[in-house]
Structures are given as C-alpha cells and as structure tokens.
Design a protein with these regions (language model features):
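NTP/phosphate- and nucleic-acid-binding module
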Residues: 1-363
Length: 363
C-alpha cells in the first residue's frame, strides 16, 4: 500500500457491509505493513515501511463513536504505555493544525525521550460523519430512514519500539521493562564447567516454575563479552553462576536498569527474581515519570516556551498561542504536541475554556 492508513480501502468495504442499524457498531482491527515515502527515514521512528496496528469503527451516533475512540485511547493505548512499556505520556487532543486529515478531533499520547524531544506514541481520531459522507457509509435506521454513520479510527506502530529504545536505553544498550521483555532473566555460567552448567539449569527450572521467562547462557566465549551482549539486549535481570560462589550455594543477581548486585542462596533466586522484576517495572515507570515532570516547564509566553523546548517540554496557556503563536513556534522547530485541561485531563475539544498546551521539539 502507498497510503500510510487503510482508511480508503476500509471505508469502501464498510459501505458494502453496513446495511442496517443491526450491523452497528462495526468494529474492525488489522495489523499490516504500510509504506510511506519518507525523505529522511529514521530507524523505528520514520521508516519507509513499517508494521502498524489500525482500527476503524462505524456507529449509529456521535456519542458511541466518541466513547469507543476514547476507550481505545485510555484503556488500550495508555494502559499499554504505562503498565507494559513503563512510558508516561501527556494525554490530550491535537490542535486543529495538527489533527488527522478529516478528523473533527484527534487524541494523542505524547512521550518525552531522554533528549527532551517529544514522540507521538499513539493516536485516536473522532471522524464524525466526514469519512462516512466521503465513502457513502449509510445504514437504515429502525424508522426505515437512511442515516450516515459516525466513524472513528485509531492506530499505533513500531514507532513505539523507537520510543522504548530512546526512553529507557542507556550507553550500554537497551533497557527493557520486565512485563514487555521476551527474556526476563538470563542465567549466565561464569565458566563452562559441568557443575556450573548443571546449577544454571537448576536455577532456570526454578525460575520457569515461578512463571519467569528465562534463558540460559552456558559459558561459550568469554564471560565479559557475554555479559556485555546481554546488557545490550536489555534483559532486566542477570543471574551469574560461578564455581566459587557455587561452593557456598550462592549466585549473584544483577539488575540491568541500575546495575545493583545482590548475592543470594541459589534456592531463593526464583521468589526474589519475581519480586525484583515487579520492582524494576515500577522503578522504570516512576523514573521516566520523574524525568518528564522535571523537564516540563510552566512558562508565560512563546519566547519562554521556545527556550524551554531546547531541553524539554513547555506548558503554557493555549490562549497565549493560537494560530499566530503556532507559526512563531514552528520557526524554531517547536510544535504544539497536545491540549489539556489545567488539571492534566483530556478535554472534549479545543473550544473548552482555560486549556493549556504542551509544546516541544519532536521526532
């Protein structure tokens, strides 16, 4: 496909599949590879071809369409970002200039990377009747009248992988949150010796029995090189099994996120590891949340916002910006990432009074 979304294809099929109010709501979801002709591709962030998930729905009323799009945004995307990716974001709506083409409202989740730039992690769109009108998506109501549907769409892509790398990674490589990690614990033999390898297998069996996703590295190649390889891959916990500690029934457990080490009895590794994995998950989220708060500056005007955007995010009254202010921000490659209520909640639309905006440089 040449289009970054399947809206045109799905719109045509919705018009064929929907005949009656009994066919509503129609809820469609797909995973597919899409192509977008990027002039300056960036790995994981803006690649010419990428895997993404997109959903499209049709409803009998605006309220139903809006409620479903909002539910996806808060209960699916935001839940996944916070509780799996350990990625705090600012939830809000896009200003008119940044909305998805044809949408009457676009919800977004904006994350901050370690360099202070914003990354749009996921979006959900209220399309009103605009797409239904363009593709003749009608249904017959209970009263026998032909009525236009209300539609929504929402999507996320492998851009989240880029967000994961830039949000949590460090100079040693990836740092993967435990709930996401395909391998949560790697058990490494310090030396390739039968007794050590047997102990590694025993530790792995205990971890598997405790529901931990585990991999064993049986000591082929230098120990230092293998440790470095697993650090690059971001495995949350490393259990080192060496002949010296093994004589006393001990192993060393190392956290990837902090590098903290603890020596444990071999038989106590499984319960301790399970506890540590949950601790790491929480610590990674809270650490990222603290960095986001620390790098978000409340400012009074656009010049201050531009200055703050050199190192992080700026928050200011939306009334101070408007279309003219957006143009002024863009001169310095700063954009309005989202609009929020003053308490940080997501507004229904951009006409609400007393809104604030989050501005930043972005990927």
């Amino acid at each position: 496909m040449n289009s970054p979304t399947s809206a045109t294809v799905i719109g045509e099929f919705m018009a064929k599949w929907i005949q009656s109010y009994r066919d509503l709501p129609l809820l469609l979801n797909q995973w597919s590879n899409v192509v977008r002709w990027e002039l300056r591709p960036r790995l994981f962030l803006r690649s010419s071809e990428f895997l993404w998930q997109e959903g499209h729905t049709a409803h009998a009323s605006y309220e139903d369409a809006n409620a479903f799009a909002t539910k996806i945004h808060l209960e699916v995307y935001n839940d996944f970002l916070e509780n799996v990716l350990a990625a705090p974001t600012y939830l809000g709506i896009k200003p008119a200039s940044e909305r998805f083409a044809g949408a009457i409202n676009s919800m977004t989740a904006e994350g901050m990377m370690r360099d202070g730039k914003a990354l749009q992690m996921a979006t959900s769109h209220e399309l009103g009747q605009n797409f239904a009108r363009a593709f003749d998506i009608y249904y017959q109501s209970e009263a026998g009248q032909a009525e236009l549907c209300y539609t929504s769409s929402w999507g996320a892509s492998t851009r989240m992988v880029g967000g994961l790398i830039m949000l949590h990674g460090d100079d040693n490589g990836l740092v993967v949150p435990p709930r996401l990690a395909p391998i949560q614990v790697v058990v490494i033999a310090v030396r390739d010796e039968p007794e050590v390898n047997d102990a590694c297998d025993r530790v792995a069996a205990l971890l598997k029995a405790a529901g931990v996703r585990v991999r064993v590295d049986h000591g082929r190649g230098s120990f230092g090189r293998r440790v470095t390889d697993w650090e690059i891959k971001g495995v949350p916990l490393r259990v080192e099994v060496g002949p010296r500690d093994l004589k006393e029934g001990l192993v060393t457990v190392v956290r990837r996120d902090t590098g903290a080490k603890v020596t444990l009895a071999l038989d106590s590794v499984a319960p301790t590891a399970a506890s540590l994995l949950e601790e790491i998950q929480v610590d990674m989220f809270e650490g990222a949340k603290a960095r986001l708060a620390e790098a978000t500056h409340d400012v009074a005007n656009i010049p201050e916002a531009i200055e703050a955007a050199e190192t992080g995010f700026a928050r200011l009254d939306w009334s101070q910006v408007g279309e003219a202010g957006e143009a002024e921000l863009k001169v310095d490659a700063v954009t309005v990432r989202c609009l929020q209520r003053r308490d940080g909640s997501m507004p229904l639309n951009d006409t609400e009074d007393d809104l604030v905006c989050i501005v930043a440089k972005s990927y």
